[in-house]
Amino acid sequence: MNRFVQNICFTVLVLLYSVQGLCQTSTADNAEHDHAPQAAIASAHPLATQTGLAILEQGGNAFDAAIAVTAVLAVVEPYSSGIGGGGFYLLHQKEDDSYVMLDARERAPLRAHKDLYLDEQGEVIAGASINGASSAGIPGIPAALVHLADNYGNLKLPQTLAPAIGYAKDGFSVDEYYQRMATFRLKALQENSAASAIFLQQGEVPELGYKVIQRDLAKTLEIIAESGFSGFYENGLAWKMVRDVRKHGGIWTMKDMGTYAVKERSPEVVIYKGMRLVSASLPSSGGLVLSEILQMLAEFDLEEMDEVQRIHFIVEAMRRAYRDRAQYM
């Protein structure tokens, strides 16, 4: 395992167009909003969405579906959703109307320091924080899958991870988006023989329909399914990863792996025109940025504006919120 394309997996709800249609509300108007009669799954890839629905049909709950969807995305979206990264999960339990945010963000190695990506002259080493072993953080997604299954799911990991294991073993077909991302990262992939052998076709961007097969990833998912946290973070697989990262200039240690832990946090809550929105809290910036945008827009009657003015107000609110994020967060 000597590829270090760091992939960060995020479960994201994008609330940009029609906030009213996606929010819980504490007002009497709640009955007017449409709700899915059973379940709705949205993901970045049809195979992941189909898998989530299949898990629900097998008796799984929403958390089991989230595990399965995350794992399949880790297989079919290696450019953005791999298990080598981290993510956030926003959970709601109907029984007690409680919310929790799982913080499974990847973590910097304990030996990381502020000058890690500077040379002896104090200059930034180009690409060092993006490519290579020194750029890799301690993965959080495997721990998140285990945490979800142990604390919230109805099904066991061997069942929820089985579809992803199958796609990793048997392969999935390259689509146009995969081609675009492979083109974007072509140089980095070509410079790593292991990555090139898996994600490229004879060293070049694969043709449409080319099967990407990831047998080592399948084995890793099988280890997680069988042995949970210890299988990935404490035993032989962890030792192999640490050894390989250090061989290629990284600073991982077994302590980094063994001390990783998912954190349960209180989510960010904002009231917008009588509706309660629950979003991700720190260390994600999403909830705070969304809150700032909506608090600015709450001062205006967007429905009374013409389309051009409404878009202008929304864009300016977003621009200011993201400026604040860049400066203060």
Stretches found by the model and what they are:
Residues S18-V19:
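N-terminal signal peptide c-region/cleavage motif recognized by signal peptidases
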Residues F300-M329:
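Internal maturation/activation junctions in enzymes
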Residues M1-C9:
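Bacterial N-terminal signal peptides that target proteins for export
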